[in-house]
């Protein structure tokens, strides 16, 4: 594998979004165990909201929020992780397409705008009781 420039950026709640905008590829490794079944896939949703293609562990709620090969890749074995990361490194157009697909997924399914009718219905139902 060719050398890829990397930079470690410590997490900072004040600069997180700005820092993420510098990413070209996101990584979301979680252990495939019972504890991880309680995870919410928020990291994957964050990557998608910002338009970052990513590789995530093929486990838990990741199956519900993303499609393998559309917004990013899912991997379980070391070989799958390696192959997925290399594909994203080598294909700028794929990264762009996946980033756009991720952003569209968040806008269509998870945004306030797309969920407003559901919220409104709940509030109207509660208010009428």
Regions found by a protein language model. Give the residues of each.
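A short, well-ordered alpha-helix in the C-terminal region of glycosyltransferases
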Residues: 94-109, 118-121
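Nucleotide-sugar donor-binding loop of glycosyltransferases
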Residues: 29-32, 51, 57-59, 69, ...
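Conserved acidic donor-binding segment of nucleotide-sugar-dependent glycosyltransferases
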Residues: 66-79, 87-93
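Short loop/helix-cap segments at secondary-structure boundaries that form the rim of catalytic
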Residues: 1-4, 65-67
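Nucleotide-sugar-dependent
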Residues: 13-46, 56-64
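Active-site donor-binding acidic/aromatic loop of nucleotide-activated sugar
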Residues: 3-12, 19
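C-terminal alpha-helical cap of glycosyltransferases
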Residues: 112-129
